[in-house]
Amino acid sequence: MEPGTARIAVDLLGGDDAPAVVVDGALRAMRADPDLHLLLVGPAEVADGLIGALDPVQRIRVTVRPVRAAVGMADHPVAARADSTVRAAVTAVRDGIADAVVSAGATGATVTAAALGLGRWPHVRRPALVATLPAVAGPVVLLDVGGSLEPGPATLVRHAVLGTAYAAVAHGVAEPRVGLLSVGTEAGKGDRLRRTADPLLAAVPLPHGARYVGLVEGYDIASGSRADVVVTDGFTGNVLLKAIEGAYAMAGGPPASGGVPRAAALLGVAGTVVVCHGAARGDDVASGIALAAHLWRRRATETVSALLDRAPQTPSQPGDHADRTTDTEVSL
């Protein structure tokens, strides 16, 4: 465990089984990390129940921001504009009361709340959700897994830079290999998005000595032998992530190189934001809180943002003037 205090704002009402599993996860996280401080955002009676389960020394590391409104899993992301728990948690980060936010609520609402409340990085049209997957040869960083469902080619290129910097800063990967997920490895394979993005990725300089290895397939993610960072659209990435989770459950567990991805970091906003699966259990929420603390202690968000600022900008492509907005996103 890395040293240093980390103040994490936790959305108590985010997730299918909130607040019970969120309270369980917060308790686990508190007991595992003596330098962790939590800001519990939600109904006071729920927070009081959690605090009552802690010993006196742990209780002084918990504060409460009473909020009763929640964004439902079926609600439109625009609901995040209201006075909801996820928006209040993001506001705490913006105001310097917390260092990072963790939510298992609706992905679209969390992304929207973060983008509106914290602001986006320059040159990032759509933030990306980044998950780290266990593979035979070592961890593989996969993005996007749900932040931008229908991006344009230039967005995929920016996400490649984001993923490369994240792999180096958050996971210590030296000279990451970057691949674009497609249906074959030969040049020209894939849909129009892949065919357009492939040569752009081949031409763009990547940070930390990274190199683009070309198109990769699904089994390359499982092996980890061809790429350390795999870029795709958020729709495909989210489906793939959940398929992998299901496969691990059926097989009895992931490879020995790492555990099932339980949370994703949101890159492209001016703050540390971690999104857990809506069906998260207590240990998943605890892992999300631990990830948020890890990223904050490494100042990962700030470092990745600085690397992105120094990276060359990708020229706009025909039809790439605006990524399509889907029902899990709003125009920002």
Q: Model-predicted segments: where are they?
A:
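Short, glycine-rich nucleotide/cofactor-binding loops
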Residues: 8-20, 147-157, 275-282
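Flexible, glycine/charged-enriched surface loops at secondary-structure junctions
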Residues: 35-37, 171-178, 206-218, 258, ...
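Glycine-rich phosphate/nucleotide-binding loop
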Residues: 115-142, 223-323
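Glycine-rich phosphate-binding loop
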Residues: 92-111, 185-189, 194-261
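Phosphate/nucleotide-donor binding subsite
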Residues: 56-98
